[in-house]
Amino acid sequence: MEEYKVKFIDFLLKTGALKVFESPSEDRTLKSKRISPWFVNIGDFNDGESSNALAGFYADAVINSGVKADVLYGIPDKGVGLAAPVAMAMASKGHNVGWCFSRKDEKTHGEATNLGPEDRIKKLIVGRAPKPNDAIVQLDDVFTAGDAKYEANTFLKSLGRSNLPLLAIAVDRQEVAIDSREAIAEYQEKTGTKVVSIVNAVDVYNVLKEGNLVPEKALERLANYVRVYGTKDARTTIGTGLEQKVIGRDRSVIPACDVETLEQFEELVKQTADVEGIGGYKIGFELGLGFGLPAVVAAARKHTDKPIIYDHQKAGTDIPDTGKNYARTMKNSGVDTVIFFPQAGPETERAWIYHALDKGLNVIVGGRMTHPAYAVSEGGFITDEGALDMYRIAARAGINNFVVPGNKPDVIKQVRDVVEAEGVSPVFYAPGFIAQGGKIEAAAKVAGDRFHGIVGRGIYQAKDMHAAAVEHTSQL
């Protein structure tokens, strides 16, 4: 890594402008509404010494880009304070350029008096007003979704200033937009403006890791955030393969514990826990809401330490922010693993996955279900491609555990192809047997080496639950 990048990150840390939080209570909400465990505030450079140093880093970024600059434009709000200092720093390095930023309100007095329409820009700009053909280099602090950058681009072009070759920022957070497109790549494509940054998220991560500059937990939280929200390059560099191992074996049967009472649940666990092929226990809202998750987990722990998987029918269908509280509740209850069906969209999916990982929970993601008329192709509401996107986004975040409909082998094949295309080696969990017509052996054949059949009534309604568990596990 270039020496100036290391120096800049060290500078950010020493000034307190870069913060990586160990505790979720310190997290910051970004303009994009994402809740982030790391934050850069260029506004913390608010004295002469730090502003001068910051300007030098920006000047190097602009000069090293090789792009010709006539005028620097500070994008409101954080970029306004950058324009003049960066111009001064560039002058000290042999590059004399103008600087400017926009007014909140059009000026009507002083030098703005009696200006013609062609000079209207002088009423709206503080500093040197760019000429029509001037190369305008825009300055801002960070790039997340890019809202302020698009607004600045539109503003300058409305004044007839369309020569906008470069945007220089301090930190590229390397995040994808809501539609999963890479935010900076999309901005460059739409505007024709090249973006350069002093450092990016991966640079920050690598320097912090190599120098042991933040607590291990804080670094882990930063890594998980980038895995979920990061661009492909960022995810690949940090490492997307979480390889969460929910079940201690490659194939098993998981009883779906949809029983009415806590006593019935405990008896189910007691009779099946010693069956070698039983991998864990899936509980749902009836037990969870009826008796409280801590009590349900405690009942299971009397007989087994096999994982407890909570399927809230269907978690991940609420707004993104609620994922944080959900994950905290699950962790406090003693649940090991959560199942999400993120039908509320990509931002909800990313948020719920991130917060679950942040709490140390295992995550299983579903998109297709066992019953008729779920997907559009079956007469339902959810588009087939939309359901596949639920799996795709999860795979890009490093998730490797997925729920698939065991009675629809063709769908299992589709999902497998999608997640393997993202570089993930999947582990599948499939309901849909017995009452819904699926065959464990047929689903397992399509799913591959790592497969767990979810069986409900076929076990808990059997006269001999132990014998039923043995029978179902023999089909693996």
Q: What is the meaning of each model-derived region?
A:
Residues 1-139, 144-245, 267-273, 286-291, ...:
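PRPP-associated nucleotide enzymes
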